[in-house]
UniProtKB/Swiss-Prot annotation:
It comes from the Bacteria. It is an enzyme of class 2 (transferase). Its EC number is 2.3.2.6. This is Leucyl/phenylalanyl-tRNA--protein transferase. The keyword Membrane does not apply. GO terms for cellular component: cytoplasm.
């Protein structure tokens, strides 16, 4: 199956995700300008490539997804959350979160896929109100968190990190519960991990994911910084 080369002049144009090859790659090239990233996410496509390689755009089949209303939290983690060890904040340290995520060792990887180019692109998306960080703080220090993109009633998780036990888990669960209150319909986890499977994430066939995503894209986007005041339930 052919891999499509993206146009420099039309960042909104992507081939149908169904045309991805067996590895999930649907297109190559282009750039990471906000218009292109937002167009990609709205179609169920995301960038994932190594430093020095061309930009590869993915739409894997199956897709690992968590429905916020199916979130599962184990007893031990609930106890940790009840103890109030971590304070969860939104969008107060986005650049620090993505930088920490870029430094997390990954099994089988010698480098990072979160390149400088990638970091700057998502910082730009954050400044535009589409990319967000969820942070776990303790004693005034950042201990863990995650970042991702929000469009419509969907959150596209990109990466997470932890510098202390359960910090990223507390951030993730707190965010998922917040998303449920907001009426979000799905959290895109991209590819399967044992870590997220424990929270109830499942593999969906691409067709099911794209159908659910199309419904989620019909809802308004919570654009802007999710600081404490902005993040309050309506």
């Amino acid at each position: 199956m052919p891999i499509y080369l993206l146009s420099d002049e039309h960042p909104e144009l992507f081939p149908p995700p169904e045309r991805a090859d067996k590895s999930g790659v649907v297109a190559v090239g282009g750039d990471l300008r906000p218009e292109r990233l937002l167009a990609a996410y709205a179609r169920g496509i995301f960038p994932w490539y190594s430093e020095g390689d061309p930009i590869l755009w993915h739409s894997p089949d199956p897709r690992f997804v968590l429905s916020p209303d199916k979130l599962h939290v184990g007893r031990s983690l609930r106890k940790t959350m009840a103890r109030g060890i971590y304070e969860v904040r939104y969008d107060t340290a986005f650049r620090r979160v993505i930088t920490e995520c870029s430094q997390v060792p990954r099994p089988g990887q010698t480098g990072t896929w979160i390149t400088e180019e990638m970091m700057e692109a998502y910082v730009t998306l954050h400044e535009a109100g589409f990319a967000h960080s969820v942070e776990a703080w303790a004693e005034g220090e950042l201990k863990g968190g995650l970042y991702g993109v929000s469009l419509g009633a969907a959150f596209f998780g990109e990466s997470m990190f932890a510098l202390a036990p359960d910090a990223s888990k507390v951030a993730f669960v707190t965010a998922a519960e917040r998303f449920q209150g907001w009426g979000f319909q799905l959290i895109d986890c991209q590819v399967e991990t044992e870590h997220l499977a424990r929270f109830g994430a499942e593999n969906w066939p691409r067709r099911r994911f794209l159908s659910a995503l199309a419904r989620a894209m019909k809802e308004p986007t919570r654009r802007g910084k999710w600081t404490e005041g902005a993040a309050a339930d309506p």
